[in-house]
Amino acid sequence: MSLSPKHTTPFSVSDILSPIEETYKKFSGAMDGAPPGLGAPLGAAAAYRAPPPGPSSQAATVAGMQPSHAMAGHNAAAAAAAAAAAAAAAATYHMPPGVSQFPHGAMGSYCNGGLGNMGELPAYTDGMRGGAATGWYGANPDPRYSSISRFMGPSAGVNVAGMGSLTGIADAAKSLGPLHAAAAAAAPRRKRRVLFSQAQVYELERRFKQQKYLSAPEREHLASMIHLTPTQVKIWFQNHRYKMKRQAKDKAAQQLQQEGGLGPPPPPPPSPRRVAVPVLVKDGKPCQNGASTPTPGQAGPQPPAPTPAPELEELSPSPPALHGPGGGLAALDAAAGEYSGGVLGANLLYGRTW
């Protein structure tokens, strides 16, 4: 920054303060047209929001007036801006003049960081019954809601100061801790299980085989022998009787299940199928009739018998050599042998076709 007064820069003190002063003049003109009831609350708000002057601020004022003048101008501009914003909000929401929800003393203590006693804040119903309610809701309320006023007595307000009694609940809960511990200690506990020695169990089982029920003198005598109490002997005999009955019942059910599971023996598997086979050779000689000889006990289809040779001879003409002299019987025998050989060959070829 140049030190010459002819050449000024926009960073000088006068250049910085001149726009703020012009803005303050504009907002102060706007405040003149604002409702008269807003001046006092906003002035009080600017007063309690500004920090209280201390020794350091007084020393700074004595040291130089220009910094304090700049700060004063800044605070004034901020107050003017807040006043203009409040005036705009009042115009927007039609806030009547003179309406105040809280006293200035309580609000000042709240904004300074010290809330103090919550009892300083009035109850909601007190404000509703005051003159502020008339400003908010009008002078002539709806007659339909006139009966509601009897429910809005002083008891309807919340007593915030009395909320400190809740700390007594925590103290009472802490005091109940020893009581719970004492009740748990006084509760009856189950006695631990007593394990008998092998000698004691052996003697008890031996006596149980002899006698399943004992009288009182017998129990006392047996208990004194094995160093037990009569009650322990009595309980052992009861448990052992129940155990024996349960084992007998399970054994009977198992036997019935085994007997029912056996059932009748399964049928034997079916024998392999037997097929009739024709007998073509019997005792080293071929069968002339070609009939099959089934084995005993078999019932198979019988093949039809071939036509006898004489009938075939009658049907077929004989060769002329047979009709010659001296060749009658020999020719017939030769023809019969040839025909029988042909029949045997046919049986060999077609004997298994059915």
Swiss-Prot record:
InterPro entries, per database record: HD (IPR001356), HD_metazoa (IPR020479), Homeobox_CS (IPR017970), Homeobox_NK-like (IPR050394), Homeodomain-like_sf (IPR009057)
Example of a GO cellular component annotation carried by this entry: nucleus
MF annotations from Gene Ontology: DNA-binding transcription factor activity, RNA polymerase II-specific; RNA polymerase II cis-regulatory region sequence-specific DNA binding
Source organism, top-level taxon: Eukaryota
SMART domains the UniProt entry points to: HOX
DNA-binding region: 189-248
GO biological process: cell differentiation; regulation of transcription by RNA polymerase II
Keywords, in A-Z order: Developmental protein, DNA-binding, Homeobox, Nucleus
Keyword Ribosomal protein annotated: no
Chain intervals for the UniProt region annotation (Disordered): 246-329
Compositionally biased tracts (Pro residues): 263-272
Matches recorded under Pfam families: Homeodomain
SUPFAM superfamilies for this protein: Homeodomain-like (SSF46689)
Subcellular location: Nucleus
Function description: Probable transcription factor.
UniProt family annotation: Belongs to the NK-2 homeobox family.
Protein name, UniProt field: Homeobox protein Nkx-2.4
Record lineage: Eukaryota, Metazoa, Chordata, Craniata, Vertebrata
Gene this chain is encoded by: NKX2-4
